[in-house]
């Protein structure tokens, strides 16, 4: 699906290459740019998945968790993070059918998935 974010989130300081337009905090992110982020507080993960009945549900957890992504959407929970370097990058693997594993180390809200119009960015502000 065009516009899917495909970068992986890990609970450590990390530098990644942006491979698609993604949600971010107060920063312009373009494809091909390098983004440095760091997780420094307790972690809350929001995952949007489909139930057997086809209803979309938002799953919250404070423990390590693995889910299969069945719907690609932007998380509706507010983002709370502390910017340590260039930008706080809070995107996880969001290709449909992919397994996503979350290692919870500290609280931070993670935007799990986002679908954007080509060359456009969705911004989420605190």
Curated annotation (Swiss-Prot):
Membrane topology recorded in Swiss-Prot or TrEMBL: Multi-pass membrane protein
**Record keywords:** Membrane, Transmembrane, Transmembrane helix
User: Which residues are on the Cytoplasmic side of the membrane?
Assistant: 1-28, 97
Q: What is its main location?
A: membrane
Instruction: Report the locations given in the UniProt record.
Output: Membrane
Protein name, per record: Uncharacterized membrane protein YAL064W-B
Give the residue spans that cross the bilayer: 29-49, 76-96, 98-118
Q: Outline which residue ranges sit on the Extracellular face.
A: 50-75, 119-126
Q: Could you give one GO CC term from the UniProt record? A: endoplasmic reticulum
């Amino acid at each position: 699906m065009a516009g899917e974010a495909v970068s992986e989130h890990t609970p450590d300081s990390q530098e990644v290459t942006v491979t698609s337009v993604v949600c971010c905090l107060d920063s312009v992110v373009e494809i091909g740019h390098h983004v440095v982020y760091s997780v420094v507080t307790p972690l809350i993960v929001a995952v949007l998945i489909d139930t057997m009945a086809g209803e979309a549900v938002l799953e919250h957890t404070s423990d390590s968790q693995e889910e299969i992504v069945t719907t690609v959407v932007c998380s509706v929970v507010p983002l709370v993070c502390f910017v340590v370097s260039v930008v706080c990058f809070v995107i996880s693997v969001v290709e449909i059918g992919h397994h996503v594993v979350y290692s919870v180390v500290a609280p931070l809200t993670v935007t799990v998935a986002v679908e954007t119009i080509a060359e456009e960015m969705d911004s989420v502000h605190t």
